[in-house]
Amino acid sequence: PTGEQVKWRIIIIMQSFKTAAKTSFVGFLFTVVAGSLLHFAFAASGGNTLVGAFTPVNESVWEHLKLLLIPAVAFSAVEFFVYGKSLPAFFAAKSLSVMIGLAAIVMLFYTYTGIVGRNYLAADIGVFIVSAALTYYLSCVFVKCPALYSERANIIGISLVADIIILFIYFTFTPPMCGLFRDPVTDDFGIPDRFYSSILIDK
């Protein structure tokens, strides 16, 4: 590329950085609102298992990670067409920030419940909001990280998100019998019996 082409490429990238910062705030708000609504989607659908594959089917910590994952991934798709095409680390930055956000929910939840001995709804909401904010903040940081400026990093990022979504779908119907997947309300795992109606059987 010529010097002029490099110059314009740099200008476009810098403008995209600014757009990323502004869009991330919108993404944060979208994720908090959409995540809050998704909490009720499975019950509102009457226990539709297709809906349950992408929304919480019980009150376990694992299932509630969908409240961050699904809106964040959906908004990332929008961001890609708004400004992401111009950023060489877009997919790597997005996937890494989402993974850290999910880990933050788990760590913050078990840390505070370990200290106080139980969970509180207000604190759970706070954990979700803080983790969502962390996700979008880190996205703005990572998108400027030269270490992620490679096709390999982006491919790994896309693969990681795809794998984790597949894992969430699989564990919706076949959850491991461990604390992360246990519904503290029913002391059970997976889809509650009152909702369990397989799409394959129905169809």
Model regions and ranges:
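Small-polar-interrupted transmembrane alpha-helices in polytopic inner-membrane proteins
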Residues: G35, H39, F75, E79, ...
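Juxtamembrane "helix-exit" motif on the non-cytosolic side of transmembrane helices
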Residues: A43-S45, L108-G117, V143, T172-P175
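Final/C-terminal transmembrane alpha-helix of multipass membrane proteins
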Residues: I155-P175
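N-terminal membrane topogenic signal
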Residues: M14-G27
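Alpha-helical transmembrane segments of multi-pass membrane proteins
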Residues: F30-G47, I169-T174
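Hydrophobic cores of alpha-helical transmembrane segments in multi-pass inner/ER membrane proteins
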Residues: K66-E79, I129-V141
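Short aromatic-rich membrane-water interface segments that cap or initiate transmembrane helices
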Residues: A53-K66, G190-K203
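Non-cytosolic membrane-interface motifs at loop->transmembrane helix junctions
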Residues: V51-N58, V116-F128, P184-T186
